[in-house]
Amino acid sequence: MRGGRVLAFLHAALALGLAAAAAGTAAPGAALPPADEKGLTDLQLLGKRVFEDANLSEPRGLSCASCHAPEHAFQGNNGSPIPGIAAGSSPDKVGRRKVPTIMYKTYSPAFGLTKDVDDGKETAEAKGGQFWDGRASDLVEQAASPLLDPVEMNNPSIEVVVEKVKAGAYADLVTAVFGKAVFADPKTAMNDLSSALFAYEATERFAPFSSKFDDYLRGKATLTPEEARGFEVFTNPKQGNCIACHVGEVKSKDPTDWIFTDFTYDALGVPRNPAIPANADPATFDLGLCKRPGIAAFLPKDVKLESLCGQFKVPTLRNVAVAGAYYHNAYFTSLRDAVAFYATRDTDPQRWYPKLKTGEADKFNDLSGALKDNVNTEEVPYDRRPGQKPRFSDADIDALVAFLKTLTDKGMK
């Protein structure tokens, strides 16, 4: 793929204004574009057309926007009965992971893996990429994946996708942006369409920084006492310690320094979600990072692949209050429960996990055998044991939820 070259070109073009003329400029007497298309370049407008095209699935009827609904912070489930887990283009197909927001995704670096040493033990730290398991290095590479996924848009090949675009309503826009020969080579055409999607997803609507917290940083809003307490719990390394992974520059008033993720991966031992059809097979486990295609090529010497099993990418917390479901498997449908799980996973595991015949909690039940040892149990707030006091209280949980609600961008619901 030409993803790296396309990304470099796009970043330069978007920054310098060298992309095609803005689509919001209409000729005298011509119909004005919809309000949400004003100011878009032709490249960005093409990306929007692809994003909203429900003819690109097999069978037709499913678009990117079907699962990534703009009003829900570009996430959703396409009418699935399982919160956060999307139905595919075929009515009998349902995914196994929560649909992630694609807002603020352009801030994620390309996927990489570095060697680390933790208490004398060699480990590997993954960072960046797209999807819960990082299987796409960047957004250009990511764009084609749902189109070909049999559980999502279900196209059998790139050639089929490109032929649909060629026969579609905006084929003239494709040739205007990329030239008349664009459809000659399907792989090149697919990469060009992916770059258009990237250009659209790099627009301000995907990273508006319009939340109350952003206004607070700018000095235009004040946090309530409860929200301020929640922010303290969030940043306190001896309480929530959320900022350890959902990072922000504490001294910065620039919203772009607060993406609320370090783009790394972690194993949290989230309870198994019985609502996911694939989980009906007790021998089936979603192992995340260690099953990323091509992961072995990134793996440092002397680091075992199995050590990455159970890890999933740390998501941004921006717009988390409108997510509707939480964690990679959408097990939690309440933001308060998702936060309480952090606080009490290890002090009261029976609250979250099913019981074994012994009466004990089947802790980390979405991992098998020795892979349960991969779960993060040392970092605050997970460094507690049954009977110990949680790192933060019920009142702190309420305050933290109140703070997280300040991260919702305007217009999201």
Which residues are covered by each model-predicted region?
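Periplasmic c-type cytochrome electron-transfer domains
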Residues: R2-R5, G24-K413
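Bacterial N-terminal signal peptides
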Residues: A8-A20
